Amino acid sequence: AAIAAGHVMGVVEPLDCGVAAGGFMTIHCSSRNKTEVIDFLGTAPASAKYELYAINDINGDYTIRVEGQHNQIGYRSIATPGTLRGFEEGHKKYGSLPMHELIAPAISIAKEGFPISYKGALRMARTAHILATTDACRNLYLKSDNSAPREGEIIQNKDYAYTLEEIAKYGADTFYSGDLARFIVNEIDKNYGFLTKDDLLKYKAIWRKPSHFNYNGLDILTPPPPSSGSLVFSGLEALTLDNKSHSAHQLLAEAMLKMFSK
């Protein structure tokens, strides 16, 4: 169910996830009382060196301004995707249904279209200038005047449906070493990106032990670093303050301060 939902989210929340993304999967097996984590974060291509990004300026805060925002926008910002290898690892060990059945709902939604959510419409409105930087992205998500779709408007993504169909037929290997891999690498190469066929071929998801924290008598388990799971621990620690002498707003502020000041 988690993998099926993950694929659907890649269709309906394309700015947050998808087959070319990455992340973590925390799995608890109740019959074995065991919790495991799969780390499938994207990794930097081997040829993506720090010195290849031209620095505009370094501000007084933690931000570094890169010329053209090439570390965030465009082909030089693309990491080696991990989602499909992560899903594959989880499915091999814990899956019960065939992978193609788990991908089928996402294929159907991408073909038929879906009403964009309030959150999705807001995100696209805020990033319309970025979505307009390539013809493919602009034609898919923006209107003729480069404005973003409004909540409830229908978006179709038939090319993504085709990609998912290929993955359903041939597995994740087509994305990392097959026809899809060749298409991805050719597109990135002609646009001076860093991702190569070797980056895709060598990518592996990693099984990790979860981080463990006890809060109010409960065992909390989250992905370990490099995830932000430790921030959850920090926030929960702040919530152990004397509730009688702190308002809910103050507790929340203290929790967020502790989380993001580390």
Please provide the spans of the model-predicted regions.
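Noncatalytic scaffold domains of N-terminal-nucleophile
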Residues: 3-171, 175-177, 181-227
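Generic N-terminal helix/loop capping motif
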Residues: 8, 12, 238, 259-262
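Serine/threonine-rich low-complexity intrinsically disordered regions
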Residues: 150, 196, 240-247
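Regular secondary-structure segments
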Residues: 165-168, 240, 260
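Extended, domain-scale alpha-helical bundle/helix-rich regions
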Residues: 228-234, 241-244, 258
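Internal maturation/activation junctions in enzymes
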Residues: 243-262
